[in-house]
Amino acid sequence: MQNSLLNTHVTTIDGEVTTLEKYAGKVLLIVNVASRCGLTPQYEQLENIQKAWADQGFVVLGFPCNQFMGQEPGSEEEIKTYCASTWGVTFPMFSKIDVNGDARHPLYQKLIAAAPTAVAPEKSGFYERMVSKGRTPLYPDDILWNFEKFLVGRDGQVVQRFSPDMTPEDPIVMET
């Protein structure tokens, strides 16, 4: 059970079926991403922390998702090209997945089971704004929006879940 997250089958953005076992012993920040979202500039911060902490075994893993207002409509090739050319993304990207609902990817089933609620910036109001726009999660533990983050420790266990508006460079994320 200890490394069940790492044993989960995933598909890279280039179509290779693999597991996350090659990241064993590393700290992971797993993020559902989208290219046409107001939070898309977080790609830059994700890349910054990836570069800053890579030599200490830190890796960002991006999982595109089109479940939130269709904000990731492109093909894997389009996503890969956009992320590299617009944001300089070099961290590992994976094939588009569902993070909520009946087709929720097994990785996200495990992540959510380990961390059913997200830490949010104090008084951010992000959740309330989403609710006011009719974007209430179907279930309390659902991913709220693009760029929700899961920090996974070197032992393969989820350490914390962060809300979409908790930026990757937020001191709370960095101190965790």
Give residue ranges: language-model regions:
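N-terminal "domain-start" segment that seeds a small globular fold
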Residues: 1-21, 39-41, 118
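Short, thiol/selenol-centered motifs that function as redox-active sites or metal-ligating centers
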Residues: 23, 34-46, 63-73, 149, ...
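Conserved helix-turn-beta segment immediately C-terminal to the redox Cys motif
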Residues: 26-28, 35-36, 40-64, 83-87
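Thiol-based oxidoreductase modules, predominantly thioredoxin-like and allied folds used
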Residues: 32, 54-76, 89-101
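Thiol/selenol-based redox catalytic cores and closely related redox-interacting motifs
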Residues: 82-167
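A short, polar/charged loop-to-alpha-helix boundary motif
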Residues: 168-176
